[in-house]
Structures are given as C-alpha cells and as structure tokens.
C-alpha cells in the first residue's frame, strides 16, 4: 500500500511522532533542577543536627539526596564562626571541608556554599573547636558602609574562599542574619563584587562558578518581618525591589538568583520575592527556594509530614517550572523528615506525582529504602496517629528490622541508628498517649499519670537534645517539646489535676526517682503545665 509522504516522512509515522510530541508537552512536567539546603547552624545531638555530622555522614547524605531525586545541595557550614585572622586550626578545618565538596560532586550533585553577608565573631570564640562554637550570642554585624571595616572583613572572607575554592556557587543571603538599619543595596552588591574577585583569583573553575544572591527579607530592613496584621509580607517589597534593581545591572558574571518564599502567602515574606523577581525579568536566572515547605524552622525533631504544604508550594510555583532554573527545599533535621524530602524531590521532578495519595508516597519511600511498609509507614505517621494506631510491639519490631535498599545504606548515622530513632519516637508517643488516656480517680492517679506523660516527653528530648540556639548545657524546657504535646498535657492537667500542690509534689518525686529530672527542676516544669486557677 502506498502511503502519503511529507518531507520524506510516511504520514502514519508523522502522525505518531507529532502525537508523541504533544503527549510530552501535555504530560508530566517538572523543575529542571532540585536542590536541598543543609543548615549547620544548630548544636544538638547526632545525627539530628546537621552540624553534628561527620565527613562520612555528609558523604552519605549526598548519596541519599541523589537517590531521592535531588541534583543540587547547599550547605551553610558557618564559616562565620571563624574569627580573623584565620588560626592554623581553622585553616586546616577549611582545607578538610573541601573534601565535603568533593563528596557532593562524587554523588553527582552541584555544591552551593552559603554565607551571610557581614557577620564575624570575636577571637574569644576560637577557644573551642570550630564545630563546637555557638556564635549567635557574640556575632558582630560588620558595617559595609565603613570602608576600613568592610576592607578588613572582605580580606578575611577572601582568605576563607581562597581555601574553599571549589564550590559550584557561592550564595549570600540578603540579611537574615546580617544587615543593619539603613543599609543600602549598594553595600550588599559590594559583597558579590568582592566574592567574584576572590573566585576569579582563586576558584577552581571561575568561568563556571556563580555568585548567587539569596533574596529573603530585603537588604537594609529593620524589623520588617513577621507576616501578621501589623507586619504583613508586603512591607519588605520596597527593600527587595531596590535590591533587585541594583543587582540586575550590577552583578558580575556568572551569577544566578535565589529568591525565597515562605510556605504560605500571608506569613513572613509570603511570595513577595518570587513576584518581584518575575516582574524584574530575572526568573531565568532564578532558583526558587520554597522555605519551610519540607519542615518548619526552628522545629523540634519529630516525624511530621508536610505533604499538603509541599503540594501547595510546588503547585504555586509550577507556573515558573519551564522558565526558572529549579527549586530548593530545606529542613533543620533531615533525618526526621525523610518522607518530606522524598515527596518534595519526586513532586518537583514530576508535578503529576503530587497527586499521589499520602499512603502510597510513604509506601514508595519504604520500597526505595528497602524497609517493611507495615513498620515504616506507621512510624513516619506516629505523631498524627492515635494510641490504637501504634501497636505495642512496633518499637521492638523496628529495632529488629533492616533496610535492604541501596538508598537505605546512606542515611546519616546509619540505618541501625535511624531505625532506633524511629522506635524511640514511637515509644515516646505511645507512652505519652497512654499516660493521658488512663483514668484518674484520685490525686495519686493524677500524679502517676502526670509523671508518666512527662517522662515520655523528656525521654524523647534526651534522644535528640534540641535546644534551639542554646548549647549542650541548656536544661530541659517545654519550648523543646512540640506544641501539640505541651497543649495536650496542659488540657489533661486542667481536666484531671484537682489537688495541684500534692499532685505536682508526688509527680516530681517520681521523676526524680527515675532520673528524668531533678526534683526541684521537675516541680518548676510541672507547675508550668499544671498552672493554678
């Protein structure tokens, strides 16, 4: 049979080819790059805090990120904890850090190095090793409008970048932390000009290594933040717009942009930075940072799923998928929210995956890790499940389980530690729910239940040791327990504690006897969740 031909193509084949093109155009679309931000600014226990990780932990995380579907990683290693001039020990730490970049490259990831624009610590901080320093109480804001102060700071920054010279991009946030009231966009631009000069002089591939402004709250803002009725996201607009207007014509090539947004429109910066970036015509240079889509910050460690937030944020920005340079997500303690990382990466690569039911997403991740669905899925959901949804033997079965998948080999801290963490969290959740579910017929019952509930919550805190911006000597506080648990305990106490003083005294003695808290400390903490009146 003779077939009609067009430009040498048989008509049938031409129709098939055109149909394939149309299907591809109408089919699953996604962002061309997916990145993940590792925040090393918090000091608490391994492997929860990224700052506690070893060289091998970072190498494993990069391999895991690659298998989850990411192709970029950004680290904030807190070089701002190194005072000028660099000590021999700090210089060696920077040399060693280059291996971290090599490990990211070995995993097939681009490595972006994050820095703040103008923070530096005093020499006194160097009394401790770099990774053990807490700079938050002692940081100084360098005045970039003071030529002498700026020159000294840029010389110190250049000395560090001379050593850590192999990153694919050098990212600097616009002022959180950093900045100062009245700061001008020209001063923020001067940071990138200085970084460009340092890269051109010392970089391993200066024609490819980008400088990237992280647009977050606007350079020069003064308490313009919060996202409430008196402090809406729109208040940062003039600051961000002025910065973008200065960056556009002033940035040295090669450069990109990292506009960040909050996980909801009416909070913090909302979508202001993305909107202004598009209006400025800078979307093709931009990677969109969907901050807190994966996990809130700061956040107490816990298996909290944010699938609906991830869906909403990625769908919000899907309009830019074809024109922007990709997306980034972040988490404070990635080992606790691996399901969120997985869903973010899969959904960003293929937007149709966002329609996948939650249970199926968790099952898919369990399969990728090579672990039993019937154990991992309820463990990942434990913070949202009632007591009857958490079998009594789940912790022991988790501890006996194994992850046979290749991806499961690369969880920071190791798969055995990971499964033990999940088991400990389930134990805490079960212990807490059991305590507040038991009947109370007298003050002795109330004291026993109050002590048991507190013991469960403090027990989980001792596993992770989260203290916000504190250090290892920071004592237990209810602010280190998730709000939903504290609120539930207060509601229980209000309904069940009648003889307040007697109940608190007896519960405190029980907590002291078990070694949970000292008796005096326990009395103070219990009084906070069982207030009088």
Locate the predicted segments by residue.
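Acidic/histidine-rich, surface-exposed loop or edge segments in extracytoplasmic proteins
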Residues: 40-47, 79-82
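Catalytic-core regions of glycoside hydrolase
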Residues: 39, 57-59, 71-73, 83-116, ...
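Catalytic domains of carbohydrate-active enzymes that cleave complex glycans
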Residues: 352-533
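Bacterial N-terminal signal peptides
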Residues: 9-19
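Catalytic domains of carbohydrate-active enzymes, especially glycoside hydrolases
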Residues: 51-79
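N-terminal carbohydrate-binding accessory modules
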Residues: 23-40, 48-53
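Bacterial N-terminal signal peptides that target proteins for export
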Residues: 1-11
């Amino acid at each position: 049979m003779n077939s009609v031909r067009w430009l040498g193509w048989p008509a049938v084949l031409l129709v098939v080819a055109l149909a394939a093109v149309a299907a591809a155009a109408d089919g699953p679309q996604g962002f061309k790059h997916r990145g993940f931000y590792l925040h090393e600014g918090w000091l608490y226990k391994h492997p929860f805090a990224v700052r506690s990780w070893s060289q091998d932990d970072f190498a494993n995380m990069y391999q895991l990120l690659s298998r989850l579907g990411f192709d970029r990683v950004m680290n904030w290693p807190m070089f701002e904890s190194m005072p000028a001039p660099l000590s021999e020990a700090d210089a060696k730490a920077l040399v060693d850090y280059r291996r971290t970049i090599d490990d990211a490259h070995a995993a097939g990831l681009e490595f972006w190095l994050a820095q703040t624009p103008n923070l530096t610590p005093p020499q006194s901080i160097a009394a401790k090793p770099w990774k053990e320093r807490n700079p938050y109480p002692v940081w100084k804001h360098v005045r970039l409008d003071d030529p002498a102060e700026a020159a000294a700071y840029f010389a110190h920054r250049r000395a560090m970048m001379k050593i850590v010279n192999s990153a694919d991009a050098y990212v600097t946030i616009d002022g959180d932390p950093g900045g100062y009231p009245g700061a001008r966009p020209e001063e923020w631009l001067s940071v990138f000009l200085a970084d460009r000069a340092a890269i051109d002089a010392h970089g391993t591939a200066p024609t490819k290594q980008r400088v990237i402004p992280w647009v977050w709250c606007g350079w020069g803002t003064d308490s313009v933040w919060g996202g409430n009725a008196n402090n809406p996201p729109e208040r940062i607009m003039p600051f961000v717009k002025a910065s973008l207007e200065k960056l556009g014509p002033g940035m040295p090539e090669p450069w990109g942009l990292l506009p960040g947004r909050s996980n909801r429109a009416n909070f913090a910066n909302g979508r202001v930075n993305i909107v202004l970036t598009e209006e400025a015509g800078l979307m093709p240079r931009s990677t969109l940072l969907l901050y807190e889509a994966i996990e809130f910050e700061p956040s107490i460690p816990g298996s909290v799923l944010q699938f609906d937030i991830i869906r909403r944020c990625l769908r919000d920005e899907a309009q830019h998928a074809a024109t922007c340079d990709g997306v980034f997500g972040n988490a404070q303690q990635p080992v606790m929210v691996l399901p969120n990382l997985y869903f973010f990466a899969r959904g960003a690569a293929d937007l149709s995956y966002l329609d996948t039911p939650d249970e199926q997403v968790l099952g898919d991740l369990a399969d990728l890790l090579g672990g039993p669905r019937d154990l991992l899925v309820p463990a990942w959901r434990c913070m949202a499940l009632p007591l009857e949804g958490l079998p009594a033997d789940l912790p022991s079965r988790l501890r006996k389980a194994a992850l046979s998948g290749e991806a499961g080999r690369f969880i920071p801290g190791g798969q055995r530690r990971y499964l033990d963490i999940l088991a400990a969290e389930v134990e805490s959740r079960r212990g807490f729910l059991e305590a507040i579910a038991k009947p109370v017929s007298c003050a002795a019952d109330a004291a026993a239940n109050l002590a048991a509930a507190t013991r469960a919550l403090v027990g989980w805190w001792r596993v992770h040791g989260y203290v916000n911006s504190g250090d290892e000597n920071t004592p237990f506080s209810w602010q280190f327990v998730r709000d939903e648990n504290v609120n539930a305990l207060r509601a229980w106490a209000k309904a069940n504690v009648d003889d307040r003083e007697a109940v608190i005294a007896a519960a405190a003695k029980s907590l002291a006897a078990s070694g949970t808290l000292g008796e005096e400390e326990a009395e103070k903490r219990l009084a906070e969740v069982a207030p009088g009146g």
